[in-house]
Amino acid sequence: MTDQQNTAASEDEAAPQFSLQRIYVRDLSFEAPKSPAIFRQQWEPSVGLDLNTRQKALEDDFHEVVLTLSVTVKNGDEVAFIAEVQQAGIFLIRNLDAASMSHTLGAFCPNILFPYARETLDSLVTRGSFPALMLAPVNFDALYAQELQRMQQEGGATVQ
């Protein structure tokens, strides 16, 4: 009986584990260089979105993933506002092979962080007295696959 319990416990320890520990805003900025004059103009915005992720290994199977969303909104030729959020999370991830770990950090974790970053940006923009900013969902799996393909074409790099 004890041998069976020990075997089950060791199998549980070797099983893949994923746990969200914390989500937080790492950095936040908002600039409205043409206010208040921009508020008196006809509103015909064009939105530019830059998206970036990075990850850093912390101690004992903990990883920080940072999703950066940078939005530049122009009204005609003038910049109405620039907003940026770095939404971060600390994740406990263990017992994954290299490919699964890479996918988890590069696609799965950013997918968790995106709704928080989107809401933070929207709140920031409306506090700046601009119309709500409704960002469409992002397919991080597709972005991750594109990045892998680009890396392989550039240098034959593989995920480790």
From Swiss-Prot:
Q: What is its main location?
A: cytoplasm
Protein name, as recorded? Protein-export protein SecB
Q: Which PANTHER family match?
A: PROTEIN-EXPORT PROTEIN SECB, PTHR36918
Q: Which family does it belong to?
A: Belongs to the SecB family.
Instruction: State its location(s).
Output: Cytoplasm
Q: Which NCBIfam families match?
A: PRK05751.1-4, secB
From the UniProt record, report the name of the gene that encodes this protein.
secB
A GO MF term: unfolded protein binding
One cellular component term (GO) for this entry is: cytoplasm
What domain of life?
Answer: Bacteria
Share what the entry says about its subunit structure, partners included: Homotetramer, a dimer of dimers. One homotetramer interacts with 1 SecA dimer.
